[in-house]
Regions:
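Pocket-lining segment of extracytoplasmic ligand-binding domains
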Residues: 172-267
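Short, glycine-/small- and polar/acidic-enriched structural segments
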Residues: 23-169, 179, 183-189, 200, ...
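Secondary-structure end/capping motifs
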Residues: 233-313
Length: 335
């Protein structure tokens, strides 16, 4: 009897130790994002609405800064613990001496579209023709800004010859174009689909599909990721793993979800007043989400090449792209 009691006690201790080891070091944390309603960041909303964060023992407060550059600034400044943002931010920050790393890929295609006001259709044939125009982006310094910089440089122009205006990622972005406050817009769905439906714009460059992404970049180009300061990752490995687990569950759910399933899960405000249009935008964007959560070496190189096209300092920098992505957490996810 005593032996059985001792064995039972030992087993209980082991279970307790295992549970303690698996528990997140920091259960309550803040996460920044730059335009949460955008389909670019849909995995975040799915993880939140489906309760995947809570299932991993996390209490996540989400702060929407309206643009990716602002959420990055919040991470650097210490006001958020993690960011759902563009992968290229990890590359740019390494050049600046900031060790920020992605831990899971959420989007395998950018999904960004450069569209121009319909009245300019006759004279704008390439991004270089945007010279002297006002271009709306989610926020200056965001991935939507980089996208235009790259396209202009690729077409032989200079991005300094246009004016970038932050218009956000929702109804405000649509209104800015409809009111004539901007001549072109670099944004994502559902904003772009809304403007297309209204025939307010025509599309100049579209990275919502694999074919479109290859036409623009010559190959794959990772988009949204979850990134954190490497110092946080090293000090909070269980918290990081829990975050990755939650986002991976969201990717798995999205892999088989129908547009109606997505519409039933997200807040109604995401529809921009048109549920049918939103579901059509979801349908057009389903191809963009990562299937594995892993960023390939080719994807890293493609993202770097995009930035180097218009950033001379980055082009000359000696960067180690392997330090922009930590793959061990995705590999540790229980499939």
């Amino acid at each position: 009897m005593k032996i059985k009691m001792l064995l039972a006690a030992a087993a209980a201790v082991m279970l307790t130790a295992t549970a303690a080891q698996a528990a997140p070091e920091k259960a309550k944390l803040t996460l920044g994002v730059g335009g949460k309603p955008l389909l670019y960041y849909l995995p975040l909303t799915i993880a939140e609405q489906k309760g995947y964060f809570k299932a991993e023992g996390l209490d996540v407060e989400i702060n929407d800064f309206g643009g990716g550059a602002k959420s990055l600034q919040a991470l650097v400044g210490g006001s958020v613990d993690a960011v759902t943002g563009a992968y290229e931010h990890t590359i740019r920050m390494q050049e600046k001496g900031q060790d920020i790393r992605a831990v899971i890929e959420l989007g395998r295609f950018p999904g960004i579209v450069l569209a121009v006001k319909t009245e300019h259709q006759g004279k704008v044939k390439s991004a270089a023709d945007l010279k002297g125009m006002k271009i709306g982006v989610t926020a200056p310094g965001s991935s939507t800004n980089f996208f235009v910089n790259y396209l202009i440089a690729k077409a032989g122009g200079n991005y300094k010859d246009v004016a970038f205006i932050g218009v956000g990622a929702g109804a405000g972005a649509v209104a800015a174009m409809q009111k004539g406050e901007i001549d072109a817009i670099s944004n994502l769905d559902p904003v772009i689909s809304k403007l297309e439906m209204d025939k307010t714009v025509f599309v100049l460059a579209d990275s919502r599909t694999e074919a479109g992404t290859k036409a623009i970049f010559g190959g794959s180009n990772p988009a949204a990721v979850l990134y954190l300061k490497n110092d946080f990752i090293e000090k909070n490995p269980q918290t990081t793993q829990a975050l990755v687990n939650a986002f991976h569950k969201a990717l798995v759910w999205l892999a088989t979800a129908k547009p109606a399933d997505v519409a039933a899960t997200v807040p109604e405000a995401y529809y921009l007043g048109d549920k049918a249009l939103y579901m059509e935008a979801v349908k057009n964007s389903m191809e963009t989400y990562s299937r594995t959560g892993v960023i390939s070496p080719d994807g890293m190189k493609s993202a770097y090449n995009m930035l180097a096209q218009f950033d001379e300092g980055l082009a000359k920098a000696n960067l180690d792209l392997n330090k922009t992505f930590v793959d061990k957490f995705v590999k540790a996810v229980k499939k």
